[in-house]
């Protein structure tokens, strides 16, 4: 193992991109996509400070999808946590959940809980 190879890998910045698909709740008018975008811009911490995204993190909105792109490291768990926090704040956490929609787990989707299965069990 050479030291030169490690220095090359360290100098190269790896950008990560995550997408939150909110099409179902936005179509049903349960939530507004603009409010989630604003919430993420205010709450994402960079360097220990919330709201100071700078050039390292960008948030873009396209119809019913929000894309968060980071130049350095960015935790997918942190994005899921903030999305859940938004749902709880707007009292829709009881109906919606955040699910990783693909194998790479860079696409999150807001889906409804499957209530039809639970109704049959409660009647017993």
Curated annotation (Swiss-Prot):
GO cellular component assignments: cytosol; cytosolic large ribosomal subunit; cytosolic ribosome; nucleolus; plasmodesma
Translocase keyword on record: no
Keyword Ubl conjugation: no
A single MF term (Gene Ontology): structural constituent of ribosome
InterPro entries referenced in this protein's UniProt entry, alphabetically: Ribosomal_eL22, Ribosomal_eL22_sf
Alphabetical UniProt keywords: Ribonucleoprotein, Ribosomal protein
A GO biological process held by the record: translation
Pfam families, sorted: Ribosomal_L22e
Protein family: Belongs to the eukaryotic ribosomal protein eL22 family.
Annotated PANTHER family: 60S RIBOSOMAL PROTEIN L22, LARGE RIBOSOMAL SUBUNIT PROTEIN EL22Z
Full protein name: Large ribosomal subunit protein eL22z
């Amino acid at each position: 193992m050479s030291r030169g190879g490690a220095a090359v890998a360290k100098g190269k910045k790896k950008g990560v991109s995550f997408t939150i698909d909110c099409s179902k709740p936005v179509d049903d008018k349960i939530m507004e996509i603009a409010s989630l975008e604003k919430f993420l811009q205010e709450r994402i911490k960079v360097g220990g400070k919330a709201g100071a995204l700078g050039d390292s993190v960008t948030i873009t909105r396209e119809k019913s999808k929000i894309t968060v792109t980071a130049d350095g490291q960015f935790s997918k768990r942190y994005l899921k946590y903030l999305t859940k926090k938004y749902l709880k704040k707007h009292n829709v956490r009881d109906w919606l959940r955040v699910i990783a929609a693909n194998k790479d787990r860079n696409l999150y989707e807001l889906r409804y809980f499957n209530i039809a299965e639970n109704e049959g069990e409660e009647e017993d």
